[in-house]
């Protein structure tokens, strides 16, 4: 396999790995809308209950 062919294969692999996550993110947003909406409700109590009672994190808890 020549250098030009190896470079072409390398570019194809890089482009495929760069494009695939973008298309997967767009496709998953519609299907996981309920999960995405529920996430802030789950994170806020965790931060309040777990992190606000620890010394280093209390700065962020107001």
Curated annotation (Swiss-Prot):
Q: Which GO terms describe its cellular component?
A: extracellular region; host cell postsynaptic membrane
Tissue specificity annotation: Expressed by the venom duct.
Q: Which UniProt keywords apply?
A: Acetylcholine receptor inhibiting toxin, Amidation, Disulfide bond, Ion channel impairing toxin, Neurotoxin, Postsynaptic neurotoxin, Secreted, Signal, Toxin
Residues with PTM Cysteine amide = 61
> Which PROSITE patterns is this protein grouped with?
ALPHA_CONOTOXIN
| InterPro entries, A to Z | Conotoxin_a-typ, Conotoxin_a-typ_CS
> Where does it localize?
Secreted
Record GO terms (molecular function): acetylcholine receptor inhibitor activity; ion channel regulator activity; toxin activity
Propeptide boundaries? 19-48
Pfam family, any one:
Toxin_8
Please tell me whether the keyword Calcium is annotated for this protein. no
Q: Which cysteines are joined by disulfide bonds?
A: 51-57, 52-61
The UniProt entry lists the main location of this chain as: secreted
What is the residue range of the signal peptide feature? Answer: 1-18
Cited function:
Alpha-conotoxins act on postsynaptic membranes, they bind to the nicotinic acetylcholine receptors (nAChR) and thus inhibit them.
Domain characteristics, as noted in the entry = The cysteine framework is I (CC-C-C). Alpha4/3 pattern.
Descriptive protein name: Alpha-conotoxin-like ImIIA
Which species is the source of this protein? Conus imperialis
């Amino acid at each position: 396999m020549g250098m030009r062919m190896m470079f072409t294969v390398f570019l194809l692999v890089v482009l495929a790995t760069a494009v695939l996550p973008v298309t997967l993110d767009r496709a998953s947003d519609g299907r996981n809308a309920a999960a995405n909406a529920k996430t802030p409700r789950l994170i806020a109590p965790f931060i309040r209950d777990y992190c606000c009672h620890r010394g280093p994190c209390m700065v962020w808890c107001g």
